[in-house]
Amino acid sequence: MKKKHRIKKNDEFQTVFQKGKSNANRQFVVYQLDKEEQPNFRIGLSVSKKIGNAVVRNRIKRMIRQSITELKDEIDSGKDFVIIARKPCAEMTYEELKKSLIHVFKRSGMKRIKSSVRK
């Protein structure tokens, strides 16, 4: 993901947590905050130590980033997202993870996201 699409600072994460809306499924919690003045969407990732060791956590983050890269044209601009991975992500394949991410994005009200998973 490019720098313009990332949330890195703790205070930016906290703003999304406190002022944003959340949606969840079994694998992810997604917090969403509208920022009309911003030309791009931004995404922050959080994968807890409860999920597994560093290898597992980094694998999950890589798969989420790749999914976001493939979906970037369909994600609404002018929004900040924080994606929190839950324990079931550790055993998921890339296709399952992407499908679950699309599901939770649709629950959050994004209409442009398509259900098809490209292999």
UniProtKB/Swiss-Prot annotation:
Annotated catalysed reactions: Endonucleolytic cleavage of RNA, removing 5'-extranucleotides from tRNA precursor
An annotated GO BP: tRNA 5'-leader removal
Pfam families: Ribonuclease_P
EC numbers for this chain: 3.1.26.5
GO cellular component: ribonuclease P complex
Protein keywords: Endonuclease, Hydrolase, Nuclease, RNA-binding, tRNA processing
InterPro entries in the cross-refs: Ribosomal_Su5_D2-typ_SF, Ribsml_uS5_D2-typ_fold_subgr, RNase_P, RNase_P_CS
Protein family: Belongs to the RnpA family.
Subunit structure: Consists of a catalytic RNA component (M1 or rnpB) and a protein subunit.
Role summary: RNaseP catalyzes the removal of the 5'-leader sequence from pre-tRNA to produce the mature 5'-terminus. It can also cleave other RNA substrates such as 4.5S RNA. The protein component plays an auxiliary but essential role in vivo by binding to the 5'-leader sequence and broadening the substrate specificity of the ribozyme.
Protein name: Ribonuclease P protein component
Gene name linked to the record: rnpA
